[in-house]
């Protein structure tokens, strides 16, 4: 059985302020028509269940906690939040990995985004997002 999928990578190394979404970057792999990426979101255009995997590497200019949360249509996805502590500013790299299953209801479209939270804004050196329609 073939599954629709998308895999995006952003390794531009941009700082992302707290409360903002992380740009998803370039499409590296894509199969099928029900998944697309634009700016800071992955667009899901067919009903069903989708497996989402996110891996992000980052540092921060200040000591503190960095939180990344997966959101579906602006609402946090339950269990898809990760926090790492930066103890040494600008030189310490940290990684957050998230996995979740989301659902798109019948006759609906949905947008997935990754939002920054915590006490310090990260500089994300790499974020990879994979989504597979199950």
Q: Language-model segments: what does each one mean?
A:
Residues 1-134:
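Extracellular jelly-roll beta-sandwich "head" domains, especially the C-terminal globular C1q domain
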């Amino acid at each position: 059985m073939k599954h629709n999928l998308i895999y995006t990578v952003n390794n531009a190394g941009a700082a992302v302020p707290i409360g903002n979404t992380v740009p998803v970057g370039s499409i590296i792999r894509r199969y099928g028509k029900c998944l697309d990426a634009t700016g800071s979101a992955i667009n899901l255009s067919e009903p069903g269940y989708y497996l989402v995997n996110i891996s992000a590497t980052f540092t921060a200019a200040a000591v503190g906690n960095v939180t990344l949360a997966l959101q579906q249509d602006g609402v946090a996805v339950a269990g898809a939040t990760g926090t790492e502590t930066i103890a040494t500013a600008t030189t310490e790299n940290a990684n957050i990995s998230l996995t979740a299953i989301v659902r798109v209801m019948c006759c609906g479209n949905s947008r997935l985004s990754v939002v920054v939270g915590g006490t310090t804004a990260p500089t994300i050196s790499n974020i990879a997002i994979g989504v597979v329609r199950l």
